[in-house]
């Protein structure tokens, strides 16, 4: 995807004051986007979204997502943050120059959510996760998977995730790729 001329960079995007109903993702970066920078999602109400922030990481395409801010979000979701290898369109070809993909300077703050999985994150040798901030987070979660050690240089301030036994019935990424 990074060698296709139609897949240029995405910079300086502001999404604000929206109300999302049933959607796959409120903000999805990838799988065709390869360089996204300075993206802001703020002042959002979410009703039954499958995911709020979805960072698709293709193992066959170098990607770089940076300076992404998710601020003042409230509502109900399956997964709040999803970062996983995305293999739906996997086409490695004969490529031998695969640079490491990276997500850095990602901030989530002022969040009030009912989630099935707030932190749906998987490590991979294909990408690096660094400099994430979680601040003023209050949510319920059935998976209770938040683990700041999965992301290098994570800052977590006032993060309050409380367990919830019953699922809200929304699909999470662990259920299938998409």
Question: Can you name each region flagged by the protein language model?
Answer:
Residues 1-178:
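Extracellular/periplasmic carbohydrate-active domains that bind, remodel
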């Amino acid at each position: 995807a990074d060698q296709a001329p139609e897949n240029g960079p995405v910079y300086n995007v502001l999404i604000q004051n929206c109300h999302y109903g049933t959607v796959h993702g409120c903000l999805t970066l990838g799988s065709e986007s390869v360089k996204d920078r300075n993206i802001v999602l703020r002042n959002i109400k979410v009703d039954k979204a499958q995911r709020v922030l979805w960072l698709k990481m293709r193992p066959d395409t170098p990607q770089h997502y940076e300076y992404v801010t998710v601020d003042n979000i409230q509502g109900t979701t399956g997964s709040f943050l999803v970062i996983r290898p995305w293999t739906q369109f996997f086409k490695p070809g004969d490529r031998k120059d695969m640079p490491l993909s990276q997500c850095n300077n990602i901030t989530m703050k002022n969040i009030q959510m009912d989630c099935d999985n707030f932190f749906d994150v998987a490590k991979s040798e294909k990408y690096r996760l660094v400099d994430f901030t979680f601040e003023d987070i209050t949510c319920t979660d059935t998976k209770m998977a938040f683990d700041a050690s999965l992301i290098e240089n994570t800052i977590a301030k006032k993060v309050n995730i409380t367990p919830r036994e019953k699922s809200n019935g929304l699909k999470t990424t662990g259920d299938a790729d998409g």
